[in-house]
Amino acid sequence: MEFRVHLQADNEQKIFQNQMKPEPEASYLINQRRSANYKPNIWKNDFLDQSLISKYDGDEYRKLSEKLIEEVKIYISAETMDLVAKLELIDSVRKLGLANLFEKEIKEALDSIAAIESDNLGTRDDLYGTALHFKILRQHGYKVSQDIFGRFMDEKGTLENHHFAHLKGMLELFEASNLGFEGEDILDEAKASLTLALRDSGHICYPDSNLSRDVVHSLELPSHRRVQWFDVKWQINAYEKDICRVNATLLELAKLNFNVVQAQLQKNLREASRWWANLGIADNLKFARDRLVECFACAVGVAFEPEHSSFRICLTKVINLVLIIDDVYDIYGSEEELKHFTNAVDRWDSRETEQLPECMKMCFQVLYNTTCEIAREIEEENGWNQVLPQLTKVWADFCKALLVEAEWYNKSHIPTLEEYLRNGCISSSVSVLLVHSFFSITHEGTKEMADFLHKNEDLLYNISLIVRLNNDLGTSAAEQERGDSPSSIVCYMREVNASEETARKNIKGMIDNAWKKVNGKCFTTNQVPFLSSFMNNATNMARVAHSLYKDGDGFGDQEKGPRTHILSLLFQPLVN
């Protein structure tokens, strides 16, 4: 179907303005409407207007950054540096949020390292060096076997006891073990034993307080599951304190780059904020979450690089719509209304909304207009054809999954865990986000590109599973209190007659298994140029879920933790 067929006339494209008021509803229906009691938005427009201004958005700082980049390139390309020092430098560059600036130099260095036989690396009997070597190569898509750790294991396949005395090597192997694939038993065993050993190490007095700090940070969440940009400030502060290996030029560049990128993000947030304010939807859907800034922070977590500005704004819009529609289904709509709304999205036809309350009509109209606009921009910028049907399909699937959950709620039905996850992975909205991501950052070219999403449904499923299960771990308590439809935790507890503690442990195990499958897919394809950005975005969506729901509901309660984190990420520059 031609894209233009889907576009309404200009007068039909106009978004409802702020002054639009919902038509009165019957009092009996108003009384049936639920409320999640979400708190008002804390990020006021006046605050955003005053705060989103940075002195680092200027040529002076960009020129200084370019000068420092050239100096660091020399360090990375130095042929006289020993292997472990080179690997540590590459590791630091990544942790400091600078890897995108040195892709060519890092690849050349790792190509040389990967060509060396493992027995000739000089790290044969060095657990730390071996683990660092394994981690860096696997992160960058090189083939490296878990068998290189065999020499550190006893006849039972567990880490030899004397290695537990070396905290630095233990920590690096723990981090490396989180990059494991399915069936890599050595890494599984190492992760299990090291998790316990590193926790116990907190009771021992180590002279290196920096190392003890790193242990606590990794046990809280391994670096592979952290959103890189969310962690950059912490890593810069940690690197600055590591006087044994700090590189002054690299540190200066890391601080400057953070501030320059933050200035770009602030410009993006201003643009997204204007879009959101002009819609006026927050004023008319009082029951729904007004979380523009949090949505933007999630988009930053998926792709922070300056060249992805338009994609970040696109993704912010999509995440906002996901939240609003989720609240329509969870809180506001009756079952009959939700069926009409689902039909409207499925048929992409506003006539299906004629019997709906004005606020639900408005919600559909915003979805319609925004999706058509995004499809047009993708077609113009990336050369794709027929994007709109792809986008409307994932929105329809999302709404159908939400409708199933609404029906479960109305019938007080608790599904089996398998039934719940089959639907819940769709209602997680990951497919919506990933399909928008795919078309936004890739370009039409080969048949392989066009078939990629279909051939990699397992990747989409496992990313969705990680997001869904993290969501349930963080929001289950609040949802049970509100009486929402059941989560995976409730389904598991009922299915096997387990305690909540046991259910949560099982859910975390499912997340671990899903990560192994994601690793197996991503680390074997991320050297393919046209896929590496998309693969990185896909795994970042899973990482955002870990961050968002680590301490509860990152969307529901802005004050509980997200506020401080967002202030640091988007508003507070680093002091040089």
From Swiss-Prot:
Binds 3 Mg(2+) or Mn(2+) ions per subunit. It is found in: Cytoplasm. Its cofactor is Mg(2+); Mn(2+); K(+). It comes from the Eukaryota. Mg(2+) 3 binds at residues 471, 475, 479. Its main location: cytoplasm. The keyword Cell membrane does not apply. InterPro entries: Isoprenoid_synthase_dom_sf, Terpene_cyclase-like_1_C, Terpene_cyclase_plant_C1, Terpene_synth_N, Terpene_synth_N_sf, Terpene_synthase-like, Terpene_synthase_metal-bd, Terpenoid_cyclase/PrenylTrfase. The activity enhancement by potassium is associated only with sesquiterpene synthase activity and not monoterpene or prenyltransferase activities. Monomer. Belongs to the terpene synthase family. Tpsb subfamily. Sesquiterpene synthase catalyzing the production of (E,E)-alpha-farnesene, the predominant terpene produced during storage of fruits. Produces all six isomers (E,E)-alpha-farnesene, (Z,E)-alpha-farnesene, (E,Z)-alpha-farnesene, (Z,Z)-alpha-farnesene, (E)-beta-farnesene and (Z)-beta-farnesene from a mix of isomeric forms of the farnesyl diphosphate precursor. Able to convert geranyl diphosphate to the monoterpenes (E)-beta-ocimene, linalool and beta-myrcene. Also has a prenyltransferase activity producing alpha-farnesene directly from geranyl diphosphate and isoprenyl diphosphate. This is (E,E)-alpha-farnesene synthase. The gene is AFS1.
